[in-house]
Amino acid sequence: MAAQPLLRILCLAGFRQSERGFREKTGALRKALRGRAELVCLSGPHPVVDAAGSEGARPDSGPCPPEEQPQGWWFSEQEADVFLALEEPTACRGLEEALETVAQALNKLGPFDGILGFSQGAALAALVCALGQGGDPRFPLPRFVILVSGFCPRGLGLMEPIMQGPLSLPSLHVFGDTDGVIPSQESMQLCSRFDGAVTLTHSGGHFIPAAAPQRQAYLKFLDQFAD
């Protein structure tokens, strides 16, 4: 019997995560989905200069390799390299470059069956799906999307494509009851914009869970896309 082909999933990192750091953060998930899915990690296009103490930051002040440089998808202030998910931004600086980065990855690294996003990456993934459903040729709709600690992006019309109408692709929304960065109600609001959304809650905080109970939920969700 031939082996089941792997589902290919483009994974969008959170804010202040380096490419290497995000690969490490998704290591448990990659192990949980071994033999079922291939995870291709992508970090944002913008270096986050003031990232001391953040995910992926080095303890010294010396230069770090590109794969270890903390990155972001866009910033919520015009001058500062910051992102505040729960506040109305004064700008969405760098967003178009973020969208172009995803478009290039889809074109050059694809095809992909699904998209997974974490935190800011989940907000971007939702926006990409909304733009694709609205006819943006850069973003053909994936077969599914997995949004971990997601939220509706704020500012400069970002929320409108998501709020205009229900998104009609299968979605799994993963969030923690004690997430102090993205409160669960933010993830639930995003979840409400998808038809037939599936939720996976856990008792933890701001991370991608991959223990046995979550593994079964991921596999059950992905089973419907097995060829």
UniProtKB/Swiss-Prot annotation:
Keywords noted in UniProt: Hydrolase, Serine esterase
Catalytic reaction(s) noted: a carboxylic ester + H2O = an alcohol + a carboxylate + H(+)
Matching SUPFAM superfamilies: alpha/beta-Hydrolases
Enzyme Commission number: 3.1.1.1
Alphabetized GO MF terms: hydrolase activity
Active site: 119, 179, 206
GO cellular component: cytoplasm; nucleus
Pfam families found in the cross-reference section: FSH1
Keyword Hydrolase attached: yes
InterPro entries recorded: AB_hydrolase_fold, FSH-like_dom, LovG
Listed transmembrane segments: none
PANTHER family associated with the record: ESTERASE OVCA2 (PTHR48070:SF6)
Function: Exhibits ester hydrolase activity with a strong preference for long-chain alkyl ester substrates and high selectivity against a variety of short, branched, and substituted esters. Is able to hydrolyze ester bonds within a wide range of p-nitrophenyl derivatives (C2-C14) in vitro, with a strong preference toward substrates of >8 carbons.
Family recorded in the similarity comment: Belongs to the LovG family.
Record's protein name: Esterase OVCA2
Highest classification ranks of the organism: Eukaryota, Metazoa, Chordata, Craniata, Vertebrata
